[in-house]
Amino acid sequence: MKPTYCGYAAIIGRPNVGKSTLLNQLLGQKISITSRKPQTTRYQILGVKTFKDIQVIYVDTPGLHASTERTINRYMNRTARGALRDVDAIVFVIEPHWESQDAWVLDNLKEIETPVFLVINKVDKIKNRAELLPLIEKVSSLYAFQKITPLSAKTGDQVGTLEQAVHQLMPESPFYFPPEQVTDRSDQFMASEIIREKLMRLLGQEIPYSLAVTLIEFRKEEKIIRISAVIWVEKKSQKGIVIGKGGERLKRVGTNARLDMEKWFGKRVFLQLWVKVKSGWADNERLLRELGFEE
């Protein structure tokens, strides 16, 4: 019987460097929400890619950041660091410049023996690739990376090169997931994340991270899925911002989310949304656990 190869690769980096976009590009479909806002990803999400006799389970993580003032930030840091345990490869994503937060993330890797690939993302914004040479020289002096790959997660340029390099580190093992499975997350989780993505994209900087989404109904019928969700905010003033004048903004969120859900689930979706206030949820450990955040 022909051997198979299977293992885990964690995708890490500071917030807003394109980790989720990279995961979606590697998988060839969207499973992790994206926006221009830092810290869009709050949970550890597994993306499964099976190619012939190789299966890679990519671990998308929240952005690692030095600021731990808020309880929610500490939760996300613990989630990201936890993803580094027992993986076979680490993909460290940066932008085409080195920042102090990148150095802070790198410090978290120096005690880990797992091979680290450095990805320089967003090179589609660079006119002359020669501009990257000083950065490559600098980062090469900081750490013995397995490979340094400039790429564009947005366009897919050179993503295949990274994927082939990751494949070479996967140990011989049975597949952990059926070949057709693409994520470990439930349909309910995907529905709530789609809603949160549409909120973050429409709200601009008005309510950066003071919202969460929970489902109160998810019912699959023969031809339709019925979903009811609550959008939680921290202050009464934020409730009005989310709803918008005459309910216009909430209606747009619902329409955009429903269209994405119908693509994901392959059937019609009936979606109802409510907005409620839960004061201080982002700094309350009990409330964070209730809203699905992991230790």
Swiss-Prot record:
Question: Hey, which family's this protein in?
Answer: Belongs to the TRAFAC class TrmE-Era-EngA-EngB-Septin-like GTPase superfamily. Era GTPase family.
Q: What ranges does the record give for the region G1, renumbered to this chain?
A: 13-20
Q: Which residues form the Era-type G domain?
A: 5-172
A GO molecular-function term, please? GTP binding
Stretch list, region G2: 39-43
Q: What's the protein name?
A: GTPase Era
| Record's keyword terms, sorted | Cell inner membrane, Cell membrane, Cytoplasm, GTP-binding, Membrane, Nucleotide-binding, Ribosome biogenesis, RNA-binding, rRNA-binding
State its role.
An essential GTPase that binds both GDP and GTP, with rapid nucleotide exchange. Plays a role in 16S rRNA processing and 30S ribosomal subunit biogenesis and possibly also in cell cycle regulation and energy metabolism.
**Gene3D superfamilies given in the database record:** 3.30.300.20, P-loop containing nucleotide triphosphate hydrolases
Report how it sits in the membrane: Peripheral membrane protein
Where are the stretches annotated G4?
121-124
Q: How does it assemble?
A: Monomer.
Residues the record lists as binding GTP: 13-20, 60-64, 121-124
Q: Where is this region: G3?
A: 60-63
Q: Give its localization.
A: Cytoplasm; Cell inner membrane
Q: Does the keyword Nucleotide-binding apply?
A: yes
For this record, the Gene Ontology CC terms, alphabetical, are: cytosol; plasma membrane
